[in-house]
Structures are given as structure tokens and as C-alpha cells.
Amino acid sequence: MKFLVMPGDGIGPEIVPVAASALETLNRKLGLGISLETVDIGFASLETSGNTFPDEALKKARDADGTIMGPTDTLAYPHLAEGGRGPSAFMRTGLDLYANIRPAKTRSGVPSA
């Protein structure tokens, strides 16, 4: 199985490698045949490629069996004409996904909003 790892912005480069490390540990223990490839998105990509979500990232996401995508700072990106693509939106439209689902659970004793 191929996973594409995209660290993103802000806390992403700190937390996404931890998730990738967890997959690598599972792979070693269970022999799942997982391979990971990292592609920069967000400000790191803007600096190197002039775009916050390069076409290469979408192509690799299409070819992968799964993706790990860190948070992105879309509101701070430059205008689209200046390379400021919103990675989440481009992933959803480029992979024909219908929603950006964020699972959540409520816990007893903890008030919900």
C-alpha cells in the first residue's frame, strides 16, 4: 500500500511525521507492505514550486492508496493567481470527493457545544 504524506503548514510538520511513524511501526510489526512518500504542500511548496498545492501532489494522491494531509493555512495564502491554491479544496475536487469529513465524538460528562 502506498501512502502520500503531506505535512502542510503550522503544526502540520510537527504532527504529521508522528502519524507517519505510527504507520511505519504498524508496517514493521504486521508486515502490511506500506510505503510512504512525502510531498510538500502549503507554504513549503510555495517557496519551492511557486504553488501551495502543486499538480504533482494531486497526481501522487491519485496514485496512492491513502493520504495523510496536515493542516494548511489557506486564509494566509496569496491569491490563486499568485499560487495560493487551497489544498483541501483541490484534493476534494481533484479526487472527486464530496465532503471534508471531520469525525468527532462526544464524551459523557463533557458538555457539547
Kindly label every feature range from the protein language model.
Residues 18, 22, 87-90:
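Alpha-helical scaffold elements adjacent to nucleotide-binding pockets in ATP/GTP-utilizing enzyme cores
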Residues 6-21:
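N-terminal basic/disordered segments at the start of proteins
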